[in-house]
Amino acid sequence: GRVTITVDGTPYDVSRSSVFDALPHVLYVPPGHDVTLEAAGDAEIAWGSAPAEGRLPVRLFTPGEMRREVRGGGPAVREVHHVLSHPLPAERLIVFEVYVPGGAWSGWPPHTHDGRIGSRYLEEVYYYRMQRPEAFALHRNYTREADLDEVLVVRDGDLVAVPGGFHPVAAAPGSNTYFLNFLAGDLVMEERAVPPVDDPDHAWIVDAWDEAPWTLPLPFGDDAPND
């Protein structure tokens, strides 16, 4: 959609046809400002907020300022867009967009930022969009202590909160998956660059992305019947 966001009388015109074929604009607004929004037709707006002291000015971040990277490897490859993460300035907010091909995993190795096992505390939400209306993904929230372990089936338009622990995502085959992350917590300004902490049980995978998976059929001997 196309939207005009007015901050203290100054208009900012932003538009995006779809999360699947265009990059976003982000308008950062500190506390104490008057904000109005006017949409030229149907539009979807993501609004995230976090406590702030107003150290930074109003600023419109454009797609050319946002770093893009391909993370992971093998069946856990995905594309991450640093929509509002360090070094782009904000007090507490961190924003990512992530694109996961159908059949792939994201957030792998699983990581945490809930204040446990040496991590810093950040709250996080996921907003999901699916390229096909029937598509779905699996979102797991769990802790090593097993006081939390839930698997959620997520579909287009679902919003998921991360109450703590690790939170990997698996896109079903054929289900190209997008999600928007808002994070905020103890990390302020440049501290927002501090990374999460990986699950020690699965951290080894970062050194083994190129290890070949099984080649099928498995070599169980020449006398094994084959279909």
Per-segment meaning from a language model:
Residues 2-227:
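Jelly-roll (double-stranded beta-helix
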